[in-house]
Amino acid sequence: MWCHNPETQRFEQEIQYDAEKCTGCGVCAKVCPNGAVTMEDGRPKLDKKLCKLCGKCENFCTQGIREIVGQEYPVKTLVKELMKDLMFYEQSGGGVTLSGGEVMAMSTDYVLAIAKALKKEEVSLTIDTCGYVPYEKFEAILPYVDTFLYDVKVMDPELHKQYIGVDNKLILDLSLIHI
């Protein structure tokens, strides 16, 4: 199975880099003050436990392929940023999609606050979800969301358990509630 946005699966910042474009020059390992980047067989290896996200490997990468991804935003700041695109939402009939990792597994209060703020601004909200979360999380946010985009990987329960690791009954049951 494949995730269409794997760069957004974690809730904290992390270093991301394009291994195919890496030349193996080793600059990232040389400049890392914490020894988090080492070279193994001509390729950089990152020890996430040692990485302090200082950004030196990103800044000194000769190929420009390292990047710190993920950023925490207070609700007000995020909504203010999203409202910069209001003209596009109005012209296209679109809105905001919360996606990546599993939005519904995040803090319910945080997601609910974003949803309420966008509803107040009359901006359409879609949430991309796998749907594998308790119904109560959906129940609280339901009045503020226009669309739930269910990312169902496999319909067959046995294959779903084999490939994803969990049964898909909860996912399918919740998707029927929102139809």
Predicted regions and their residues:
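Iron-sulfur cluster-binding cysteine motifs and their immediate structural context
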Residues: M1-F11, V27-L46, K56-Q71
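Short cysteine/histidine-rich metal-coordination sites, predominantly Zn2+-binding motifs
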Residues: I15-K21, K45-L50, G70-E81
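Cysteine-rich micro-motifs
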Residues: C51, G55
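Conserved AdoMet/S-adenosylmethionine-binding subsite of the radical SAM
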Residues: K76-H178
